[in-house]
Amino acid sequence: QAPTDADLLSVLIEDAQAGHDPRVVLALHTAPVDLDPFSEEAIRAANPAFGDFQNAAETLAMAEDARRMPSREPEYRNLILNQRVDMNAPFVSQRVWQECGAPVVDDFRGLPVFGGLDLSEVSDLTALVLVAPVDGVWHVKPTFWLPGQGLADKARADRVPYDLWARDGWLQTAPGRTVDYEYVAAHLRDLCETHDVRKIGFDRWNWRHLKPWLAKVGFADDQLEGDAAIFEQMGQGFESMSPALRDLESALLNKRIAHGRHPVLESCARNATVQTDSAGNRKLSKSKSHGRIDGMVALAMAMSAAGTWEGAAVIDHMAMIG
């Protein structure tokens, strides 16, 4: 079926079910909503060819993936169970997220480092997430910034304990009412001087504001743009984010992520849902208006940047052979 009630196919099915035109015969194979959606019974109800020319093992594997990863469940229900469903879903289940909560190594120096930078408006949460490979697992090290002035008020407005996170060192506060791009640029300069930073993906929307500050703190032109640039622009729409989410999702499902249960990043993971377009491409969106997902957007960009590294294929192979 089509995903929503407004789709033409949905309208045609409902018209046929109502019997308005006696010349139309409807044969609809769909899994009843009261069945376990991941059971073989539900699959067989929607797929008369299951086990015949429809590969049973592949279909059952899709069911298991959808059970473990909520972001895949709407597509599974729509395409395999032939159900009409809301195509927005949580990106990652708490169980899968917690399974990847192993401690993170203290120091990324000496390792190839990749990053994702989600630049906010100057008064909102800004996130830089770094990933580095350690024994076949991508270790995750996030940094979050908010303006220090008015932090308690923002915590009340967003219903998020920013002030407590800042007190405990999980959140960095910038002086004043804004997180100035100069402040972020200086942090990136220090990072690149002390670490082997290969690539940092970032939202192209605010590049025009950040680029002058990066040049001012000492980044060369060829580090900012061109084939050898450290910084790589990434769009935030369906076309750009869908491959990045696929890489991140694969790493989470195969336990090739170690995030250390960072509370700010974990809050972003809980807030992140997946929005799907008509072509099946996906991007992250917020589950509620006051929730923040900046850390997950930055993590997805970091994993996308890491995919350009020649050693990433070795990690993928290690996951396949288990």
Could you say what each language-model-derived stretch is?
Residues Q1-F114, S123-L125, H139-Y183:
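Non-catalytic, compositionally simple segments
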Residues D15-A45, A157-G169, W213, V217, ...:
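Metal-dependent DNA phosphodiester-chemistry modules and their immediately adjacent helices/loops
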Residues A2-L8, D124-A127, R208-K216, S242-R246:
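A short acidic (Asp/Glu
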Residues V122-G136, I293-V297, M301-M303:
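Acidic, metal-ligating active-site segments
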